[in-house]
Amino acid sequence: MQTNTTRDKTIDFIKGILILFVILGHTTLGLTDMYSFDDTMNGIANVIYSFHMPCFIAVSGFLYSEYVGNASQGIFSRICHKAFNILLPYVMISVIYWIIKFALSNLIREPVAVSSLISIPWKPIEFLWYLYALFLLYCVAYMVDYVFARLLPHFNYKMELLFVLFLIIAFTCYGSFHYEGFNYIAGFQMYFYLGCLIKKWLDKLYNRYAVLSLAVMSVLVESSGIVLQDDMSSNPLCSSLFERLTACIVTVFIFAVSYFLSGYCDFPKWLQTIGRDSMPFYAMNVIFVGGIRIILNRAGITNMALQCICGFAGSTAICWILYECIIKKIRLIDFIFYPGKQLHIRK
């Protein structure tokens, strides 16, 4: 089993890779909205969105599983800590993002309603749904832990049971609630517990080649699913099952390959930095992706490949520069993304 130091670096690497997928996803999605006829951009966007957010949620579950059963904190205290570390940044970033969109509404030709600002507590603005959902997923996990600790304290297959339970809930309940928060829980809690399971599996795999075999197995399972995809597409239930299992399998593959490689090479420091301090990159990239797209369109540059490359590379570079030159050095701005750190509240 690997040391905690190696493990932290590997998780930072995984998060860094996922942030790059987030930026690329926002770039391709924007181009898809603009050029809906382009099959290439649609395909890239569909592939990215099939796994990158479930994998991000699995990372949170992976990290969470290290603190399961921590009796030093009560459930209320744990939820309050997450409120400072996730919910407070969600509110501040949402308000700032709304103000920016409102100020640039004429330029982006998209109406910005005051109602979207008022509804932030129950209806997230665009991409910020992830932070809102993540807080709810943690709350559910804390409450479930509380129940299990009192009713089944010695039950060894809690994570497996919860993963299967929320997989069933995803099929039966997702999209049926008026309140979006319940839909987030129904649709994504299973990936949170998938991350917990991955942590449990990796702790039992002492040999790097056993980890590699897990990656190979995930590829074989996914390949067989792709072969049968056409037969399953006619059945909505089978199609939904394929989509969710694809997200799970790709997530397992990313973890397994990353941990296998961690024993043979050092991950790029800049990618670990993006993963370690992912919040500013996640929050800012949409603005710069959209800005670059507007500038290129006004300059008469409509080539899809060029727009995609410029949007992805440009927004990543701008986010990096702002992070290194401003966010890290000005505590007030850093507070927007990491209030818990500034207030010395642990995660």
Residue ranges of model-derived segments:
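Membrane-cytosol interface segments of multi-pass membrane proteins
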Residues: M1-L167, C265, T273, A299-K347
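Juxtamembrane "helix-exit" motif on the non-cytosolic side of transmembrane helices
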Residues: G30-Y35, A103-L107, F171-H178, S224-N235, ...
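Interfacial loop-to-helix transition and helix-capping segments at the boundaries
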Residues: M41-M53, I118-A133, C173-Y191, G225-F253
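Cytoplasmic juxtamembrane interface segments
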Residues: V59-S77, H178-I185, L241-I249, S258, ...
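Transmembrane alpha-helical segments
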Residues: S60-Y64, L136, V140-V144, M190-L202, ...
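Aromatic-enriched alpha-helical transmembrane segments of multi-pass intramembrane proteins
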Residues: P121, V144-C238
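Alpha-helical transmembrane segments and terminal signal-anchor/GPI-anchor hydrophobic tails
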Residues: I185, L205-Q272, I287, T302
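Hydrophobic alpha-helical membrane segments
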Residues: R276-G290
